[in-house]
């Protein structure tokens, strides 16, 4: 997971992960804000959960989780991504892991797009059904994707729209299967969410990638 502005959410995330059943959780945190490092470290010290931090000197957004996943890929076939503004029950991580498959990603936020594609006219898919986009908040994915150097060649101006880029690389460049997960999450409304400042960029990036061949009728 990544952290940036909300250290007060981190203890709740730890408690949710501590409560998971049927799995052994190890948490890797990419922190984009050195100013909250001490708060995060203190919370982790009070938890029985194994936690490893990377405190980055500048905010690189959700791309940080891709760097963590690349480090883990040689030894772990799958990784689960969560966000700090999510609430989830004790069986959630086990459900995600039960859906793990080679060359695939399964996640809670999963959509298809109309033609012509428009990000904000996206169409939700049912649980277990194929998607063209899967968000990184509440996802299990084959870590082989993080050994593909193309994933780290995202255009600089769209670096903070890494969720769209990941779906493009997985779906279009690699032909992977994307699906809606059967796991359930609740989200905490928060105006500090980085997503709120990327409304225009998400559609611009989708159009940019469509011009490069993604989301054609198939």
Residue ranges, per PLM feature:
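C-terminal catalytic/acceptor-binding lobe
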Residues: 9-13, 153-218
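A conserved acidic beta->alpha catalytic loop
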Residues: 31-42
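Conserved donor nucleotide-binding strand/loop of the catalytic core
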Residues: 46-60
